[in-house]
Amino acid sequence: MYTQHGKAYQVKARAVVMANGSWTTRHIVLDLDAARRDAYTQFHRSPCLIANIALRNWRFLYKMGISGGYWFEGMGVYGGIRTVPAFATEIKEIGPDSPVVLTLKVLFCRPGLPMEEQQTRGRAELISTPFREYERKIREQLTDMFAATGFDAKRDIAGIILNRWGHAYASPQPGFFFGKNGKPAFRDILRNSAFGRIAFANTDLSGDPSHVTAIEEGERAAGQLLDAPLTG
């Protein structure tokens, strides 16, 4: 189903590849068999906040001889200057006084809690926290780490954009790749064959979220449908 100009339309196809997120498939394919439905409950996704911070300069990092790094306290785990794309013969030079975008990655780990509970609580925090609170924490974190080398949040930050990813990263548990206790891996239940005219793809099934595995999984699923006889 989709809408266009305020009108709803229905699309029919002889075969379909379900390449959507693993947490949604069992709610879309309503007649999914028990084995596949159970398999889809075994895919776990962790939330992530990506903050893109527009900086008027990055001299405070340049003085330290770095363009990014990891840390272990406070908000976030990693920050780095984004690469500026260059096209054709264009030459891009970035000096310490150039305006740039600093990307900050924030994870929501709660060591000691079961994985699913960590993810559920993390998603709740990710979504419920207002922008102003994230902005305050970002300014405080950068000030705490870089004030000594000249960072001034009021002067240097031109803007902040937040991308809230509730199901950002696949989190494979023991048995995800090769099975457990003599039982097949849950991903293989979905990858090995189509469900009638429906095949399943998504980077979740590979355990490696990237554009490469997305293409490979899509090709595999399409091949299963093309190789199978379609009747009716």
Kindly give the residue locations of the regions a language model identified.
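Glycine-rich loop(s) and the adjacent beta-strand/alpha-helix scaffold that form part
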Residues: 3-73
